[in-house]
């Protein structure tokens, strides 16, 4: 009987612990950094996320009229030695992660490249 009571108490404690445990949530900046790493683009996660989010802000506000202007902004913001291909991968990943409604802008640029 004591053994059963101990098991029941253990289960109650376990359930209570699960109920108050913080829930895991996706971190888009980490996902973005991981995608960039796949392209060989490294750097501070927060800085790269800031650049990526600014790509979207610049497209939304009209500062960048097209993805070519966004790519120029990214190229100037990333480390020297970043290839043109990596710049475009960065822009594409930024749009996919932070402003997917701007996909047509990147698609038009891809058709012109």
Go through the PLM ranges and name each one:
Residues 41-49, 81-87:
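Short, surface-exposed acidic
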Residues 49-63, 75-78:
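Amphipathic alpha-helical segments that form the core helices of the histone-fold
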Residues 31, 50-54, 86-94:
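Extracytoplasmic/secreted proteins, especially bacterial periplasmic and envelope-associated proteins
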Residues 6-18:
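Bacterial N-terminal signal peptides
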Residues 63-113:
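Compact alpha-helical subdomains of small soluble proteins
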Residues 16-31:
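C-terminal region of N-terminal signal peptides and the immediate post-cleavage residues
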Residues 1-5:
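Bacterial Sec-dependent N-terminal signal peptides
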Residues 28-42:
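Short N-terminal segments immediately surrounding and downstream of signal-peptide cleavage
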């Amino acid at each position: 009987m004591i053994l059963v009571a101990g098991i029941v108490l253990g289960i109650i404690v376990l359930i209570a612990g699960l109920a108050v445990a913080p829930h895991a949530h996706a971190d888009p900046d980490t996902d973005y950094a991981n995608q960039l790493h796949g392209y060989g683009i490294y750097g501070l996660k927060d800085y790269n996320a800031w650049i990526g989010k600014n790509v979207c802000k610049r497209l939304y506000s009209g500062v960048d009229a097209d993805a070519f202007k966004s790519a120029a902004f990214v190229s100037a913001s990333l480390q020297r030695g970043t290839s043109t291909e990596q710049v475009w991968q960065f822009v594409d990943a930024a749009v996919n992660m932070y402003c997917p409604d701007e996909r047509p802008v990147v698609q038009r640029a891809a058709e012109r490249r």
